[in-house]
Amino acid sequence: MARFEEQKLYIGGRYVEASSGATFETINPANGEVLAKVQRASREDVERAVQSAVEGQKVWAAMTAMQRSRILRRAVDLLRERNDELAALETLDTGKPLAETRAVDIVTGADVLEYYAGLVPAIEGEQIPLRETSFVYTRREPLGVVAGIGAWNYPVQIALWKSAPALAAGNAMIFKPSEVTPLTALKLAEIYTEAGVPDGVFNVLTGSGREVGQWLTEHPLIEKISFTGGTSTGKKVMASASSSSLKEVTMELGGKSPLIIFPDADLDRAADIAVMANFFSSGQVCTNGTRVFIHRSQQARFEAKVLERVQRIRLGDPQDENTNFGPLVSFPHMESVLGYIESGKAQKARLLCGGERVTEGAFGNGAYVAPTVFTDCSDDMTIVREEIFGPVMSILVYDDEDEAIRRANDTEYGLAAGVVTQDLARAHRAIHRLEAGICWINTWGESPAEMPVGGYKQSGVGRENGLTTLAHYTRIKSVQVELGDYASVF
């Protein structure tokens, strides 16, 4: 028996039954418990959501900037009031430790919404003088109805990162959460409605990407798609979105990010950064620094410091506030990660720790994989080339700066990169040469609301967060005004 009642769709400011009659289950990865049956949206439901969004967006866009700003600020207050309640639900659905979801997931999502709520009155056009009797002015107008397609690793945070700039700019959004972790997006929809967002401005459709996601990307009344997920799926979404009606797209895709530790680095700090960059959220973070480059002279000392920190990781029940490392998000994903680990062993990477499923006692009922560190890795190994999205660190040895940067850039991905060094000139020189959209110097992982994030190469298109993202949820209308006579050539 499921823990929660059957979950419906959220359309037009309320829960509605899916017309398909079909459902799927969402599972607690810590113990295999069925959390809820979730209704699967049909094409008819997509059409209902689009029509609701079209009508709601007209009401929303007609409000003054300050009215929209106040409503979004009210939603921020509600999110913060219910932080612990939402965090508990996120922990059940994702398997992330409660200590993590309380401190990060809802907090960082609310921060982004607060940031954009404050920017609503600052959306403005330009006035461009041409001559004494003529000038041009521009208007930044909302796109209309947009769609967000989320990933399973940060369900409510991603829903907020996508909806906050969209709604701030006067758009309506239809959001499709991952079918692996769909629960908190529905709660966000409730909060938006309670805060005063007009009916239809934020709708949630649950279901598969192959069906619901595809129908959204193809719909002619949807003006933009914002997608977070794997690169192969992102390519399909982008192709469908552009071929159907030349939609704008934002793609936050995969990564295989390099972390370069230079010989002068503080190795304690470097080990702290490397462990956080690989094992936070059980390694299920798109920006993880999974390729760790260490200078040959420092390899043994660095490995010892990494192992010392891995031994301090508190793997356990996500509900236990002492736990800081939980299960992977699902059993199928666990099998995928274990497959990569076996590949690393087969290709002769040297295993320093982990490398297996954790099955002791109650852990055997969950999707637990031990924190895993491989060393003596080579650039052609599968664990070094492909995104694993799990707790697997690959340590690679280099001899000089040019070699490290060349090898760091030798990937189809370009999401993130980082360096650890006490030499400020070297830090900036290296960062400027690294082919990645998000870079860190002597730190890793923080993505504040003010910071545009997104990738180079096959890690994405466009950005999320920051001022630039708000602009991309608007379109510019240019208007020329002539105050003098009009001279016709005829």
From Swiss-Prot:
Binds 2 potassium ions per subunit. The record marks 248 as: Seems to be a necessary countercharge to the potassium cations. SUPFAM superfamilies: ALDH-like (SSF53720). The active site is at residues 162, 252, 286, 464. The keyword Zinc does not apply. Involved in the biosynthesis of the osmoprotectant glycine betaine. Catalyzes the irreversible oxidation of betaine aldehyde to the corresponding acid. Belongs to the aldehyde dehydrogenase family. This is Betaine aldehyde dehydrogenase. The gene is betB.
